[in-house]
From Swiss-Prot:
Changing residue 207 to H: Found as heterozygous variant in patients with Bardet-Biedl syndrome; might have a modifying effect on disease phenotype. CDD domains: PH-like. It comes from Homo sapiens (Human). The gene is BBS5. The BBSome complex is thought to function as a coat complex required for sorting of specific membrane proteins to the primary cilia. The BBSome complex is required for ciliogenesis but is dispensable for centriolar satellite function. This ciliogenic function is mediated in part by the Rab8 GDP/GTP exchange factor, which localizes to the basal body and contacts the BBSome. Rab8(GTP) enters the primary cilium and promotes extension of the ciliary membrane. Keywords: Bardet-Biedl syndrome, Cell membrane, Cell projection, Ciliopathy, Cilium, Cilium biogenesis/degradation, Cytoplasm, Cytoskeleton, Disease variant, Intellectual disability, Membrane, Obesity, Protein transport, Sensory transduction, Transport, Vision. This is BBSome complex member BBS5.
Amino acid sequence: MSVLDALWEDRDVRFDLSAQQMKTRPGEVLIDCLDSIEDTKGNNGDRGRLLVTNLRILWHSLALSRVNVSVGYNCILNITTRTANSKLRGQTEALYILTKCNSTRFEFIFTNLVPGSPRLFTSVMAVHRAYETSKMYRDFKLRSALIQNKQLRLLPQEHVYDKINGVWNLSSDQGNLGTFFITNVRIVWHANMNDSFNVSIPYLQIRSIKIRDSKFGLALVIESSQQSGGYVLGFKIDPVEKLQESVKEINSLHKVYSASPIFGVDYEMEEKPQPLEALTVEQIQDDVEIDSDGHTDAFVAYFADGNKQQDREPVFSEELGLAIEKLKDGFTLQGLWEVMS
Protein backbone atom coordinates (compact mmCIF):
# COMPACT_ATOMS: atom_id res chain seq x y z
CA MET A 1 0.00 0.00 0.00
CA SER A 2 1.33 3.46 -0.89
CA VAL A 3 1.50 6.25 1.70
CA LEU A 4 -1.07 8.04 -0.44
CA ASP A 5 -3.71 5.34 0.09
CA ALA A 6 -3.85 6.25 3.79
CA LEU A 7 -3.44 10.00 3.22
CA TRP A 8 -6.68 12.00 3.31
CA GLU A 9 -5.69 15.18 5.12
CA ASP A 10 -4.82 17.28 2.05
CA ARG A 11 -7.38 15.80 -0.34
CA ASP A 12 -10.61 15.77 1.64
CA VAL A 13 -13.09 18.11 3.33
CA ARG A 14 -14.41 16.66 6.60
CA PHE A 15 -16.76 17.84 9.32
CA ASP A 16 -17.14 16.94 13.00
CA LEU A 17 -13.84 15.05 13.17
CA SER A 18 -12.88 12.75 16.01
CA ALA A 19 -10.05 13.73 18.33
CA GLN A 20 -7.78 11.26 16.49
CA GLN A 21 -8.50 12.85 13.10
CA MET A 22 -7.69 16.28 14.52
CA LYS A 23 -4.15 15.14 15.33
CA THR A 24 -1.29 15.64 12.88
CA ARG A 25 -0.30 12.59 10.82
CA PRO A 26 3.38 11.65 10.19
CA GLY A 27 4.96 14.38 8.07
CA GLU A 28 2.21 16.90 8.89
CA VAL A 29 3.52 20.05 10.56
CA LEU A 30 1.60 22.77 12.39
CA ILE A 31 2.67 26.09 10.83
CA ASP A 32 0.35 28.64 12.43
CA CYS A 33 -2.34 28.85 15.09
CA LEU A 34 -4.85 31.69 15.21
CA ASP A 35 -7.19 32.18 18.13
CA SER A 36 -10.41 34.21 17.94
CA ILE A 37 -11.43 33.05 14.47
CA GLU A 38 -15.12 32.73 13.60
CA ASP A 39 -16.45 30.19 11.11
CA THR A 40 -18.87 32.76 9.74
CA LYS A 41 -20.53 30.48 7.16
CA GLY A 42 -21.24 27.43 9.31
CA ASN A 43 -21.01 28.62 12.93
CA ASN A 44 -21.68 32.35 12.90
CA GLY A 45 -21.29 33.83 16.37
CA ASP A 46 -19.10 30.97 17.62
CA ARG A 47 -15.55 31.88 18.64
CA GLY A 48 -13.00 29.28 17.53
CA ARG A 49 -9.40 28.47 16.70
CA LEU A 50 -7.89 28.09 13.22
CA LEU A 51 -4.91 25.76 12.75
CA VAL A 52 -2.79 25.95 9.60
CA THR A 53 -0.69 22.87 8.76
CA ASN A 54 1.32 21.95 5.67
CA LEU A 55 -1.60 19.78 4.44
CA ARG A 56 -4.84 21.42 5.58
CA ILE A 57 -6.73 24.07 7.53
CA LEU A 58 -8.49 23.01 10.73
CA TRP A 59 -11.10 25.05 12.59
CA HIS A 60 -12.76 24.06 15.85
CA SER A 61 -15.12 25.77 18.24
CA LEU A 62 -13.57 26.76 21.56
CA ALA A 63 -16.87 26.06 23.32
CA LEU A 64 -17.41 22.60 21.82
CA SER A 65 -14.38 21.02 20.14
CA ARG A 66 -16.38 18.35 18.32
CA VAL A 67 -17.80 21.20 16.20
CA ASN A 68 -14.96 21.37 13.71
CA VAL A 69 -13.93 21.24 10.07
CA SER A 70 -10.86 20.10 8.12
CA VAL A 71 -10.15 21.56 4.66
CA GLY A 72 -7.41 19.90 2.57
CA TYR A 73 -5.38 22.18 0.30
CA ASN A 74 -5.85 19.87 -2.68
CA CYS A 75 -9.61 20.57 -2.54
CA ILE A 76 -9.23 24.37 -2.67
CA LEU A 77 -10.36 26.02 -5.91
CA ASN A 78 -10.02 29.64 -4.84
CA ILE A 79 -8.99 31.76 -1.85
CA THR A 80 -9.92 35.42 -1.65
CA THR A 81 -11.15 38.10 0.73
CA ARG A 82 -14.67 39.48 0.78
CA THR A 83 -17.02 41.33 3.08
CA ALA A 84 -19.05 39.14 5.44
CA ASN A 85 -21.58 39.72 8.20
CA SER A 86 -20.29 38.37 11.49
CA LYS A 87 -22.47 38.16 14.59
CA LEU A 88 -19.42 38.97 16.69
CA ARG A 89 -17.85 41.71 14.54
CA GLY A 90 -20.61 42.94 12.25
CA GLN A 91 -19.71 43.72 8.64
CA THR A 92 -16.01 43.01 8.16
CA GLU A 93 -13.45 41.63 5.72
CA ALA A 94 -13.23 37.83 5.87
CA LEU A 95 -11.31 34.98 4.26
CA TYR A 96 -13.41 33.20 1.63
CA ILE A 97 -12.41 29.68 0.53
CA LEU A 98 -14.18 27.79 -2.28
CA THR A 99 -13.53 24.04 -2.37
CA LYS A 100 -14.54 20.98 -4.35
CA CYS A 101 -14.54 17.49 -2.88
CA ASN A 102 -15.99 14.42 -4.64
CA SER A 103 -17.89 16.68 -7.11
CA THR A 104 -19.51 18.63 -4.22
CA ARG A 105 -18.65 22.30 -3.72
CA PHE A 106 -18.32 23.78 -0.24
CA GLU A 107 -17.56 27.35 0.70
CA PHE A 108 -16.03 28.57 3.95
CA ILE A 109 -15.87 32.07 5.40
CA PHE A 110 -13.48 32.69 8.28
CA THR A 111 -13.43 36.01 10.15
CA ASN A 112 -10.64 37.22 12.42
CA LEU A 113 -12.24 38.64 15.56
CA VAL A 114 -9.05 40.61 16.34
CA PRO A 115 -9.45 44.00 14.58
CA GLY A 116 -6.71 45.13 12.21
CA SER A 117 -4.85 41.82 12.02
CA PRO A 118 -4.06 40.59 8.46
CA ARG A 119 -2.44 37.36 9.73
CA LEU A 120 -5.44 35.18 8.87
CA PHE A 121 -5.14 36.14 5.20
CA THR A 122 -1.34 36.07 4.93
CA SER A 123 -0.85 32.72 6.70
CA VAL A 124 -3.48 30.71 4.84
CA MET A 125 -2.73 32.19 1.42
CA ALA A 126 1.06 31.82 1.77
CA VAL A 127 0.91 28.20 2.97
CA HIS A 128 -1.59 27.26 0.25
CA ARG A 129 0.74 28.83 -2.33
CA ALA A 130 3.65 26.82 -0.89
CA TYR A 131 1.52 23.66 -1.26
CA GLU A 132 0.63 24.47 -4.88
CA THR A 133 4.27 25.13 -5.86
CA SER A 134 5.66 21.94 -4.29
CA LYS A 135 3.66 19.31 -6.20
CA MET A 136 6.82 17.69 -7.57
CA TYR A 137 7.26 16.14 -4.10
CA ARG A 138 3.83 14.51 -4.25
CA ASP A 139 2.71 14.05 -7.87
CA PHE A 140 3.67 11.45 -10.46
CA LYS A 141 5.19 13.41 -13.39
CA LEU A 142 5.92 12.50 -17.01
CA ARG A 143 8.05 14.64 -19.36
CA SER A 144 8.76 17.42 -16.85
CA ALA A 145 11.68 19.84 -16.60
CA LEU A 146 13.69 17.48 -14.38
CA ILE A 147 17.15 17.57 -15.93
CA GLN A 148 19.58 20.45 -16.42
CA ASN A 149 23.03 19.90 -17.97
CA LYS A 150 22.60 16.12 -17.56
CA GLN A 151 22.09 16.62 -13.81
CA LEU A 152 18.91 16.12 -11.78
CA ARG A 153 17.40 19.42 -10.65
CA LEU A 154 17.18 18.75 -6.94
CA LEU A 155 14.21 19.87 -4.87
CA PRO A 156 14.79 21.58 -1.52
CA GLN A 157 15.28 18.84 1.13
CA GLU A 158 16.16 16.31 -1.60
CA HIS A 159 19.38 14.25 -1.60
CA VAL A 160 20.62 11.82 -4.27
CA TYR A 161 21.56 8.42 -2.83
CA ASP A 162 22.47 6.72 -6.10
CA LYS A 163 22.88 7.54 -9.79
CA ILE A 164 22.92 4.55 -12.13
CA ASN A 165 23.95 4.87 -15.77
CA GLY A 166 22.84 2.47 -18.49
CA VAL A 167 19.35 1.72 -17.16
CA TRP A 168 16.76 0.62 -19.72
CA ASN A 169 13.17 1.84 -19.48
CA LEU A 170 11.04 -1.06 -20.73
CA SER A 171 8.00 0.98 -21.75
CA SER A 172 8.56 0.27 -25.47
CA ASP A 173 9.36 -2.89 -27.46
CA GLN A 174 13.01 -1.90 -27.90
CA GLY A 175 13.42 -0.18 -24.54
CA ASN A 176 15.09 3.20 -23.99
CA LEU A 177 18.56 3.61 -22.54
CA GLY A 178 18.88 6.22 -19.81
CA THR A 179 19.99 7.29 -16.35
CA PHE A 180 18.31 6.34 -13.07
CA PHE A 181 18.35 8.42 -9.87
CA ILE A 182 17.41 7.24 -6.38
CA THR A 183 16.76 10.07 -3.89
CA ASN A 184 15.17 10.40 -0.46
CA VAL A 185 11.82 11.56 -1.92
CA ARG A 186 11.48 9.96 -5.37
CA ILE A 187 12.76 7.81 -8.24
CA VAL A 188 13.74 9.61 -11.47
CA TRP A 189 14.67 8.20 -14.88
CA HIS A 190 15.49 10.06 -18.11
CA ALA A 191 16.51 8.95 -21.60
CA ASN A 192 20.13 9.70 -22.53
CA MET A 193 19.24 10.74 -26.10
CA ASN A 194 16.41 13.04 -25.01
CA ASP A 195 16.32 14.10 -21.35
CA SER A 196 12.79 15.53 -21.74
CA PHE A 197 11.64 11.90 -22.06
CA ASN A 198 11.56 11.25 -18.32
CA VAL A 199 9.53 10.16 -15.32
CA SER A 200 9.47 11.27 -11.68
CA ILE A 201 7.89 8.86 -9.18
CA PRO A 202 7.59 10.17 -5.60
CA TYR A 203 7.65 7.53 -2.85
CA LEU A 204 4.25 8.94 -1.87
CA GLN A 205 2.85 7.51 -5.13
CA ILE A 206 4.62 4.11 -5.07
CA ARG A 207 2.36 1.14 -4.40
CA SER A 208 4.89 -1.68 -4.83
CA ILE A 209 8.56 -2.27 -5.74
CA LYS A 210 9.47 -5.75 -7.03
CA ILE A 211 11.87 -7.76 -9.19
CA ARG A 212 10.02 -9.57 -11.99
CA ASP A 213 10.94 -11.57 -15.04
CA SER A 214 10.40 -9.88 -18.42
CA LYS A 215 11.32 -10.55 -22.04
CA PHE A 216 14.44 -8.49 -21.32
CA GLY A 217 15.33 -10.64 -18.29
CA LEU A 218 14.96 -9.73 -14.61
CA ALA A 219 13.73 -6.15 -14.15
CA LEU A 220 12.79 -3.67 -11.46
CA VAL A 221 9.01 -3.15 -11.58
CA ILE A 222 7.41 -0.14 -9.87
CA GLU A 223 3.63 0.08 -9.55
CA SER A 224 2.22 3.54 -8.87
CA SER A 225 -0.90 4.38 -6.83
CA GLN A 226 -4.38 4.35 -8.34
CA GLN A 227 -4.63 8.12 -7.82
CA SER A 228 -1.64 8.64 -10.12
CA GLY A 229 -3.07 6.38 -12.82
CA GLY A 230 -1.92 2.94 -11.65
CA TYR A 231 1.17 2.86 -13.89
CA VAL A 232 3.40 -0.22 -14.03
CA LEU A 233 6.96 0.77 -14.97
CA GLY A 234 9.81 -1.61 -15.74
CA PHE A 235 13.54 -0.83 -15.58
CA LYS A 236 16.43 -3.12 -16.60
CA ILE A 237 19.46 -2.69 -14.34
CA ASP A 238 22.60 -4.74 -15.00
CA PRO A 239 24.23 -6.73 -13.53
CA VAL A 240 21.67 -8.65 -11.46
CA GLU A 241 23.66 -7.90 -8.29
CA LYS A 242 23.24 -4.17 -8.93
CA LEU A 243 19.51 -4.69 -9.58
CA GLN A 244 19.08 -6.49 -6.25
CA GLU A 245 21.14 -3.86 -4.43
CA SER A 246 19.04 -1.04 -5.97
CA VAL A 247 15.72 -2.69 -5.07
CA LYS A 248 16.92 -3.17 -1.50
CA GLU A 249 17.96 0.50 -1.31
CA ILE A 250 14.67 1.77 -2.80
CA ASN A 251 12.61 -0.38 -0.42
CA SER A 252 14.64 0.90 2.52
CA LEU A 253 14.23 4.56 1.50
CA HIS A 254 10.52 4.00 0.81
CA LYS A 255 10.10 2.57 4.31
CA VAL A 256 11.89 5.55 5.88
CA TYR A 257 9.77 7.95 3.81
CA SER A 258 6.52 6.17 4.77
CA ALA A 259 7.35 6.58 8.47
CA SER A 260 8.04 10.31 8.05
CA PRO A 261 6.93 11.68 4.66
CA ILE A 262 8.43 14.85 3.18
CA PHE A 263 5.51 16.72 1.61
CA GLY A 264 7.65 19.66 0.48
CA VAL A 265 5.47 22.47 1.87
CA ASP A 266 8.14 24.76 3.27
CA TYR A 267 6.87 27.79 5.20
CA GLU A 268 7.88 29.05 8.62
CA MET A 269 6.27 31.57 10.94
CA GLU A 270 8.50 33.85 13.00
CA GLU A 271 6.75 32.64 16.15
CA LYS A 272 6.52 28.85 16.41
CA PRO A 273 3.06 27.63 17.51
CA GLN A 274 2.53 24.99 20.18
CA PRO A 275 2.08 21.34 19.09
CA LEU A 276 -1.40 20.58 17.75
CA GLU A 277 -2.14 18.14 20.58
CA ALA A 278 -1.62 20.93 23.13
CA LEU A 279 -3.94 23.28 21.25
CA THR A 280 -6.88 20.98 20.63
CA VAL A 281 -9.50 21.01 23.36
CA GLU A 282 -10.21 17.53 24.73
CA GLN A 283 -13.58 16.25 23.62
CA ILE A 284 -15.93 15.61 26.52
CA GLN A 285 -18.17 12.55 26.30
CA ASP A 286 -21.80 13.50 26.81
CA ASP A 287 -24.42 11.23 28.33
CA VAL A 288 -26.50 11.72 25.20
CA GLU A 289 -26.04 9.07 22.53
CA ILE A 290 -25.70 10.58 19.06
CA ASP A 291 -26.99 8.55 16.14
CA SER A 292 -24.78 9.47 13.17
CA ASP A 293 -26.14 6.89 10.71
CA GLY A 294 -27.38 8.55 7.56
CA HIS A 295 -26.85 12.03 8.98
CA THR A 296 -26.37 14.40 6.03
CA ASP A 297 -27.11 17.71 7.73
CA ALA A 298 -23.87 18.54 9.54
CA PHE A 299 -22.30 20.25 6.55
CA VAL A 300 -25.39 21.59 4.74
CA ALA A 301 -24.56 25.15 5.81
CA TYR A 302 -21.33 25.00 3.79
CA PHE A 303 -22.85 23.97 0.45
CA ALA A 304 -21.94 26.22 -2.45
CA ASP A 305 -24.99 25.68 -4.66
CA GLY A 306 -23.07 26.71 -7.77
CA ASN A 307 -24.88 24.29 -10.10
CA LYS A 308 -28.30 25.73 -9.29
CA GLN A 309 -29.54 27.54 -12.42
CA GLN A 310 -32.90 28.71 -11.03
CA ASP A 311 -35.03 28.60 -7.89
CA ARG A 312 -36.70 25.30 -7.15
CA GLU A 313 -40.51 25.17 -7.33
CA PRO A 314 -42.39 26.43 -4.23
CA VAL A 315 -44.25 23.90 -2.09
CA PHE A 316 -46.58 24.39 0.87
CA SER A 317 -45.02 23.52 4.24
CA GLU A 318 -47.62 22.38 6.76
CA GLU A 319 -44.99 22.71 9.50
CA LEU A 320 -44.42 26.42 8.77
CA GLY A 321 -47.83 27.21 7.36
CA LEU A 322 -46.43 28.93 4.28
CA ALA A 323 -44.89 28.24 0.88
CA ILE A 324 -41.17 27.48 0.76
CA GLU A 325 -38.66 26.52 -1.93
CA LYS A 326 -38.60 22.73 -2.36
CA LEU A 327 -35.70 21.21 -0.42
CA LYS A 328 -32.89 19.29 -2.14
CA ASP A 329 -33.13 15.49 -2.01
CA GLY A 330 -31.88 14.05 1.26
CA PHE A 331 -32.57 17.13 3.40
CA THR A 332 -35.40 17.86 5.81
CA LEU A 333 -36.73 21.05 7.34
CA GLN A 334 -35.98 19.66 10.80
CA GLY A 335 -32.39 19.01 9.74
CA LEU A 336 -31.97 22.60 8.55
CA TRP A 337 -33.25 23.91 11.88
CA GLU A 338 -30.71 21.70 13.67
CA VAL A 339 -27.88 23.24 11.62
CA MET A 340 -29.11 26.77 12.41
CA SER A 341 -29.16 26.03 16.13
